[in-house]
UniProtKB/Swiss-Prot annotation:
Pathway in which this enzyme or protein is active: Glycolipid biosynthesis; lipid IV(A) biosynthesis; lipid IV(A) from (3R)-3-hydroxytetradecanoyl-[acyl-carrier-protein] and UDP-N-acetyl-alpha-D-glucosamine: step 2/6
Pfam family, one: LpxC
Enzymatic reactions: a UDP-3-O-[(3R)-3-hydroxyacyl]-N-acetyl-alpha-D-glucosamine + H2O = a UDP-3-O-[(3R)-3-hydroxyacyl]-alpha-D-glucosamine + acetate
Annotated binding of Zn(2+), by residue: H78, H237, D241
GO molecular function: metal ion binding; UDP-3-O-acyl-N-acetylglucosamine deacetylase activity
Requisite cofactors: Zn(2+)
Superkingdom as given in the UniProt entry: Bacteria
Name of the protein in question: UDP-3-O-acyl-N-acetylglucosamine deacetylase
Enzyme Commission designation: 3.5.1.108
Active site residues according to the UniProt entry: H264
GO biological process terms, semicolon-separated: lipid A biosynthetic process
Keyword vocabulary terms for this entry: Hydrolase, Lipid A biosynthesis, Lipid biosynthesis, Lipid metabolism, Metal-binding, Zinc
PANTHER family from the UniProt entry: UDP-3-O-ACYL-N-ACETYLGLUCOSAMINE DEACETYLASE 1, MITOCHONDRIAL-RELATED
Length: 309
């Protein structure tokens, strides 16, 4: 059967919050089958831990943030993206501040942490959410959509009127039966424009942002001396964010996701629209690995002895 996955051991890292600028210690712990993805603020007294769910996303202006019973955790999308990319079903995430550390602005450091901790299979069937019919959310010319598809495929288009972005690819399609999350998506960094950074800082935000954890652009060019990691890093980062936003469902998706000029808010609204329509989705498990979509048959991160053939 296709099994659930967790960490072999706990692991910690320290970084800064992108918006708060605060020093943050993040600890990732193994969790029992069917636990799901659970956050806990250890700096708050008597704070109950909470499981990620779309309705707990309360802020999507600059990042994806969860809030439950007064405990808020912001900038979850890169960590959530890494968990999705490595197929982690069950994990406890502890933080001593209100924001996941930004690290280098991508999901790469979180992928490294998860791989260092080790990934193990558990004696429980992995549960998927399968898209049964098209679900769409629109605002003006922006839109996001789920379609039925036996696998996991994403199509994302951005439209930035900036010379440094326009000459890179502004559309990308990835089918995870054929493409590697780690190699092709995970290292794409968040990006921002200098005039926006200055405005955010005047409001007490982006205090932890720097050229070490973001691509920064002025009116004409990329300011980072090392340039881009991918030719199409801008749109790849938007896809990285979307993968993390969608994993707030708590289960991997079997279906196709398409987006045009979308962000955290629209991604979350699409999840809410999906869950509100009971005819649009169903849970799925696979007793035989060969019956599962190719995107999920040979999960990344397992020891070679556990890789499926």
């Amino acid at each position: 059967m296709l099994k659930q996955r967790t960490l072999k051991k706990e692991i910690s890292a320290t970084g800064v919050g992108l918006h708060s600028g605060d020093k943050v210690t993040l600890t990732l712990r193994p969790a029992a089958p069917d636990t799901g993805i659970v956050f806990r603020r250890i700096d708050l007294p008597d704070t109950a831990e909470f499981k990620v769910q779309p309705h707990l996303v309360t802020d999507t202006k600059l990042c994806s943030a969860l809030e439950c019973n007064g405990a808020r955790v912001a900038t979850i999308e890169h960590l959530m993206s890494a968990l999705a990319g490595l197929g982690i079903d069950n994990i406890r995430i502890e933080l001593n501040a209100g924001e996941v550390p930004i690290m280098d602005g991508s999901a790469g450091p979180f992928v490294f942490l998860l791989q260092q901790a080790g990934i193990v299979e558990q004696d429980a069937m992995k549960k998927f959410i399968r898209i049964k019919k098209t679900v769409e959310y629109r605002e003006g010319d922006k839109w996001v959509r789920f379609d039925p598809y036996f696998g996991f495929k994403l199509d994302f288009t951005i439209d930035f009127n900036h010379p440094a972005v326009e000459h890179t690819g502004q559309r990308i399609t990835i089918d995870f039966a054929d493409n590697s999350y780690i190699k092709e998506i995970s290292r794409a960094r968040t990006f921002g424009f200098m005039h926006e950074v200055e405005a955010l800082r005047s409001m007490g935000l982006a205090r932890g942002g720097s050229l070490d954890n973001a691509i920064v652009l002025d009116e004409f060019r990329v300011l980072n001396s090392d340039g881009l990691r991918y030719d199409d890093e801008f749109v790849k980062h938007k896809m990285l964010d979307a993968i993390g936003d969608l994993y707030v469902l708590g289960h991997p998706l079997i279906g196709a996701f398409s987006a045009y000029k979308a962000g955290h808010y629209m991604n979350n609204q699409l999840l809410r629209a999906l869950l509100a329509d009971g005819d649009a989705w169903e849970y799925a498990t696979f007793a035989k690995i060969e019956e599962a979509p190719g995107a999920f048959r040979n999960p990344i991160g397992l020891p070679p002895a556990l890789q499926y053939v």
